[in-house]
Amino acid sequence: MPRRLILSATERGTLLALPESQDDLIRYYTFNDSDLSLIRQRRGDANRLGFAVQLCLLRYPGYALGTDSELPEPVILWVAKQVQTDPASWTKYGERDVTRREHAQELRTYLQLAPFGLSDFRALVRELTELAQQTDKGLLLAGQALESLRQKRRILPALSVIDRACSEAIARANRRVYRALVEPLTDSHRAKLDELLKLKAGSSITWLTWLRQAPLKPNSRHMLEHIERLKTFQLVDLPEVLGRHIHQNRLLKLAREGGQMTPKDLGKFEPQRRYATLAAVVLESTATVIDELVDLHDRILVKLFSGAKHKHQQQFQKQGKAINDKVRLYSKIGQALLEAKEAGSDPYAAIEAVIPWDEFTESVSEAELLARPEGFDHLHLVGENFATLRRYTPALLEVLELRAAPAAQGVLAAVQTLREMNADNLRKVPADAPTAFIKPRWKPLVITPEGLDRRFYEICALSELKNALRSGDIWVKGSRQFRDFDDYLLPAEKFAALKREQALPLAINPNSDQYLEERLQLLDEQLATVARLAKDNELPDAILTESGLKITPLDAAVPDRAQALIDQTSQLLPRIKITELLMDVDDWTGFSRHFTHLKDGAEAKDRTLLLSAILGDAINLGLTKMAESSPGLTYAKLSWLQAWHIRDETYSAALAELVNHQYQHAFAAHWGDGTTSSSDGQRFRAGGRGESTGHVNPKYGSEPGRLFYTHISDQYAPFSTRVVNVGVRDSTYVLDGLLYHESDLRIEEHYTDTAGFTDHVFALMHLLGFRFAPRIRDLGETKLYVPQGVQTYPTLRPLIGGTLNIKHVRAHWDDILRLASSIKQGTVTASLMLRKLGSYPRQNGLAVALRELGRIERTLFILDWLQSVELRRRVHAGLNKGEARNSLARAVFFNRLGEIRDRSFEQQRYRASGLNLVTAAIVLWNTVYLERATQGLVEAGKPVDGELLQFLSPLGWEHINLTGDYVWRQSRRLEDGKFRPLRMPGKP
């Protein structure tokens, strides 16, 4: 059986692609005087040109010219121009093979290159094995191999040799990973791992299948079941050191492979691989269960508190009429008493003139019942749900291993008290129980004359535990999402080394004094400029007075002439089925090749099956209904393909392919250069089985839902999407899309709406090199912050909210740089850090310092906004593109009433990724045919104003048939270079 190739044909072409753009030709193939002197020693144009070309190829990419090498025309033209020869003479070079070999030998000596030999192959495999322990992606390994050989000044061998070296390195790395996971295991561990493949007692599924099931609903019953899962994992009792020296990517991939396999498949593995795979599954699944338990507990508490608040409001509203009646009555009584005092008459008689004394006495009693305590709050109603918490919290606290930072030691001590009370079945809280963690709001309920109230002490401790877990002040052993805050960051030694070497991956001056002096000086100048413009009433389309700020709304952005062109081009676009559109786009881009097999990296053999699974995600149909709607397909086939070929990383790679094609398409340049983008959240209601996984945000009503948060470039390409909770602020995820997309876009400026900004985001955006420009609603209410000691600006007084605490920034400068560097290098995601920073108590030093830094940037941005109508137009236009893209997404995601009905978060992610991929395909297809439509108008004698092309949009879908049976007719595929006919008037 032939060895499976690591590199695909496309990847091979990418690795040794020759430069063709003018900039790249100048960079790689510009000769110096020494080069030209050597070249001129050749006789005849053909020899000079051939010798020069060989010199170029040996220098970059680094391989020798073969007898059958085909070179791009731009390379020949550029080299010929430099050596002043006729490009046509290239065809005559190498007629004598001896000449070509002699030239190659001379150039090897000149460039000090050595041929690639067996010893080099062995050394390369050893080197690649280290990298292969981190990733088994062939393209990354091959790229590293080529770079290493160039540094060692070796002539590159054939790519088949590189492929073989990568393959051997991956095999060696796999064996090392297996060995690292298996050697620490005892016979007892192995026996317990084997037990996981057996049927669970009284069930038709194995222990492993049951253990990997996600909780269905956030309630006490499912919490207890999930706690049992964690206890079962803990009984396996794997060594603590297991997996610590294995790269997380490899461990996760091995766990995914094991999760997709049947017990029968796993049982067929040789022992070392079987135990390694099972150990990886247990390690990853244990962390997942811990994170899910903490999240479930968080959601249950949020639900109980929200319910108490809602009930509190309902009670208050129900008593509103009675309270109003009492207020009106006592107002009359008060007025009567005032008049009686002025007249010197009997006050009691005055009261009885308003209401009989018996009724007055009764009204006072009623008022006492209606009256609320001074700390009018809903917390007392939370106690009604104490029984819900008691069903599972004793088991939860017992199974979680908690650690705490100094700031949360009081909370951890309270948790330990609860554990001891549960163990001893105590009903009363000990008098010496810790109370320092109790916030003022809770004290009246917890600390009573009779002692500490058991219900409210426990609820308060659990609530504070939830907050501390969110912020990272308390962490859980074995968790991924709830670890020690410092564990997420670059190691202190590595950060110190980067700073010392001036190699921090940040876009600012790392010297705090110089940086702050520069920013504060700029801030002072901008404040003075805006104050002067406001005083002279010269702010463009804005007025600032004592009563506040007023900005004139922007005019309509689309002129009438542009609308006519929009209508003309949309009528010309060919009508097409969504299946045919996806086949067209895949023929152009080959995006389907990125959906590789999880185990061996092979491309999907059945493209129709793959595209059907993707489309099933995109239109929210699901695999079962997709199989019914696609002749020749079955659920089993689609399910198998999804399990092995569809993952987050394959969706990301395929999306990047489409975004890159859009980025490189000439017509897309009419809409932007790919350096600006916007992001927005789109809510989808959670229904059916997915309802229990949804979250409620009062902004969207009382129904649960999920948010698809998507980034879109100025060229309309949606380059990132993720599923988030509707209860989390959009700003948490803004940076993720900018930092972790895989496309060639180089975003410099980013737009969001009001929900997309916080001061922390402003700070991190600036530190990481992005210009942040949110469209802030009620801008006049968003205050400016000024440096201490600067002159006052009376004109700006309505906008100024306070002074900046620069001392805090200086004190925590290294912490800020370390955090930003960690995010940039991918040690931790921006969203995770922003969630934790947002959950910190107000006194946390890093959170406050980052907020102050963000206030500087937010103030500078607002001052810029007030001075620039062009900035307002850019932001408005960018956000409009995102909103229009949401309309397209809503149209595509039409099945199941547009509701999220998938129970697992993984399936919900696939829905979002499939939707984003298909909308990106529609955008690219429309871009191609909008260009052809404008060309068609010109050819028909209807001139097109180039200035109006920016107003066209590739987001239309009226010409696309999204419904019906999903048939993939290969007969409808186009030949290379062919296009579908436009709907020109007068043509059939």
Swiss-Prot record:
UniProt keyword annotation of NAD present: no
Alphabetic keyword roster: DNA recombination, DNA-binding, Plasmid, Transposable element, Transposition
Keyword DNA-binding part of the UniProt annotation: yes
InterPro entries attached to this UniProt entry: DUF4158, Tn3-like_transpos, Tn3_Tnp_DDE_dom
GO BP: DNA transposition
A Pfam family: DDE_Tnp_Tn3
Any GO molecular function: transposase activity
Function: Required for transposition of transposon Tn501.
Protein family per UniProt: Belongs to the transposase 7 family.
Name of the protein: Transposase for transposon Tn501
Organism: Pseudomonas aeruginosa
Gene: tnpA
